[in-house]
Amino acid sequence: MLRLSERNMKVLLAAALIAGSVFFLLLPGPSAADEKKKGPKVTVKVYFDLRIGDEDVGRVIFGLFGKTVPKTVDNFVALATGEKGFGYKNSKFHRVIKDFMIQGGDFTRGDGTGGKSIYGERFPDENFKLKHYGPGWVSMANAGKDTNGSQFFITTVKTAWLDGKHVVFGKVLEGMEVVRKVESTKTDSRDKPLKDVIIADCGKIEVEKPFAIAKE
C-alpha cells in the first residue's frame, strides 16, 4: 500500500506541474494593440516658471522625447538653459488663442517674427512621427516646411489638422492648470495678451530612466 501511495503521489505531482505549465502558457502576453498604445519616451524634462503681468502663476514641467526627435529636443533644452548665451528666459508668450494653443519662444523680437535655433536661424523638420493627440503637447511653430527656429506652441485641445506640418517633441507633465491660466488671459484682436506672459525662469531637469507616456 505504501508503494502504491508513493506512486499515486508522484502521478499527482506530475499532473499538477503539467497543469501549472499549461496555465502559464495560456496567460495572455502583451498584444500588438497594447504595444501600439505605448507612447514616446521622456528622456529629459524642462521647466518654465511663468508670470502674467506682476503675478507669478506657477511652474510648467515638460517631458521631452529625445529618442524620437533628438535634434529638436536638444534645441529646446539648450534654449531653456541658456547654455549658448541666448534663450527663453524672460521671453514672452506672444500669441494666445483659447481652445487652440499658446505660443512663445520668440526671444529676439517678442512678436512672432523672430527667434533662432542653436543650429542657426532655422533648421529642417526632423520628422513627424508624433501627432497633436490632445491638450498639452508641445510642437514647433514654423513659417512653412523646414523653418524651425525657437518658437513653439502648447496645444490646449487636440489639433489633428497640424499633424505632419509641425514637429511634436514634448508633452506637459505637470502644470497644465498654469497653461490654462495663460490660455484664459485676455488678448487683443491679434491674439496678443493684454498683460505680458513671461517665462520668468526656466531650466533642465535630468531624467534618470526614460519612461513612456500615453498618446492622449
From Swiss-Prot:
Its main location: virion. It is found in: Virion; Endoplasmic reticulum lumen; Melanosome. The modification S-nitrosocysteine is found at residue 202. Residues 47-204 form the PPIase cyclophilin-type domain. Inhibited by cyclosporin A (CsA). The keyword Nucleus does not apply. One of its GO terms (molecular function) is unfolded protein binding. This is Peptidyl-prolyl cis-trans isomerase B.
